[in-house]
């Protein structure tokens, strides 16, 4: 049922984006439409209807190209770093009756916003290189732990903390095991002699 109504729900996309006449509501409409198209594609793939999938994929491709053209035509947004620091500087410039901004605003007005926004930048755009490989995360964490604890690497483990805790135990555990083995052996001989 939905497959018959779906093509009517997705109008044809204009080929040339208007210069600056596009609104966020129109962009949201295309994003919602794209979501419906993706759901229809998935549904038709599950049903084995490849012809319908191809039609929906073509519409989705047109929508994506249109949105990309709009994004390319728009001026780049201001970077998030300078905006908060200028807002903080403007707040500090205005006199407050009896109120004083926290000292960290005065000491590092630009370092604070950069520290807040820098890690979020790659995540907002879905960078495939950052935070993708768990082994790289473990290695970075392991190196950080080694730097703090002065431990030399012996190999990859599940996580850096576990590795850092295992190495000292290995040395201690070996000594304890040897002592325990001698004691157990003596006790064992005594028990065997008693039988």
Curated annotation (Swiss-Prot):
Keywords: Activator, Transcription, Transcription regulation
Protein encoded by which gene: GIF2
Subunit structure: Interacts with GRF1.
The organism of origin for this protein: Arabidopsis thaliana (Mouse-ear cress)
Expression across tissues: Predominantly expressed in shoot tips containing the shoot apical meristem (SAM) and flower buds. Also expressed in mature flowers.
Role, per record: Transcription coactivator that plays a role in the regulation of cell expansion in leaf and cotyledons tissues. Component of a network formed by miR396, the GRFs and their interacting factors (GIFs) acting in the regulation of meristem function, at least partially through the control of cell proliferation. GIFs are involved in the positive regulation of cell proliferation of lateral organs in a functionally redundant manner.
Stretch list, region Disordered: 166-195
Family classification: Belongs to the SS18 family.
Entry protein name: GRF1-interacting factor 2
Biased composition (Basic and acidic residues): 181-195
Gly residues bias: start-end ranges: 171-180
TM helices/strands, residue ranges: none
Residues spanning the signal sequence: none
Pfam families reported for this sequence: SSXT (PF05030)
